[in-house]
Amino acid sequence: MIVTLTANPAIDRNVTVDRLVFEDRAYILSTRKAAGGRGINASCVIRAFGADTLAIAPCGGKSGKLLEEFLSSCGFAFELVRVRNEIRTNMTVADRNGLAIKLNEKGPELTATEVGRLEKTVRQHLKSASWPLLCGSLPPGVPADFYARLIHAASKQGVKTLLDADGEEFDAALDERPTVVTPNQQEAERLLNRVLLTRNHFQEAAERIRGMGAGSVVLSLGARGAMAALEDGSILEAVPPRVEALCPIGAGDALAAAYAWSLRRNPDPVDALRWGVAAGTASARLPGVSFASLDQTREVYQRVTTRRIA
């Protein structure tokens, strides 16, 4: 079973408008709410691909009750850790041309006791996890080494980990050598404090992040695909077909989920990278924040090209 942790879940309000233009009005075409957060999104993809998954997240307030209602209809197992404060609400606004903006709240302040309960819950499921996916931002009150502690605990039990995080918590977790990390371009730029513009930049970034402690690095590059620096020292590139992207937000979550799903079936990182890029690309073709089915992803997978750079 693939276990996902969403340390800072949300109710996602996804709004589609006719067009997004700076300092001009836009008309709402549709709106919907859903359970959100990187780990929850990953569990949605894994479930759509026919695999078992358990989603773990804190949950509090009226928004937390709504989160539980949404998760109950998702078709996968979940375990919620009760917290006092209201979980956050995030908003995504996208137009029909693929332009999108995401507005995120910081999330609820967690007490030390609540943080301890959340950590204990994840630790209890490590032994049964084929892959724990540690995903997203940490809410206020959660120490920056939270993911690092979980990766350390998993490593002691011989459990492989995938980290999809940003900022200080990403940096701190690298010291514990996560098996795979999946930063996007902006997250890699923040970590390395440099702008990445060219293929050489992407390759150098992936290699540098691997050198900081990650076993393998999958650098998500949106419409350009992904660059991977693997544990054996090889560098891979995966390029998707050209598609009309309606909403790229959430594509990175789909990539991380499909990468872990593929490795669980077949320990071939080349094939996993191909599936990951296919899942991200197929999901970006859908309106709003949506995730492609296995059949939709397979159609794109057949057109993703991979090659070894080094």
Predicted regions span which residues?
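Conserved phosphate/ATP/ADP-binding segment of small-molecule kinases
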Residues: 144-234
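Conserved N-terminal subdomain of the carbohydrate kinase-like
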Residues: 24, 48-129, 299-310
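Short beta-strand scaffold segments in enzyme catalytic cores
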Residues: 44, 89-93, 225-229
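Glycine-rich phosphate/adenosyl-contacting loop at the front of the ribokinase-like
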Residues: 1-56, 64-66, 244, 310
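Conserved phosphate-binding/catalytic region of the ribokinase-like
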Residues: 171, 199-310
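Short acidic, glycine-rich surface-loop motifs adjacent to enzyme active sites
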Residues: 128-139
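Gly/Ala-rich phosphate-binding loop of Rossmann-like dinucleotide-binding domains
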Residues: 47, 155, 264
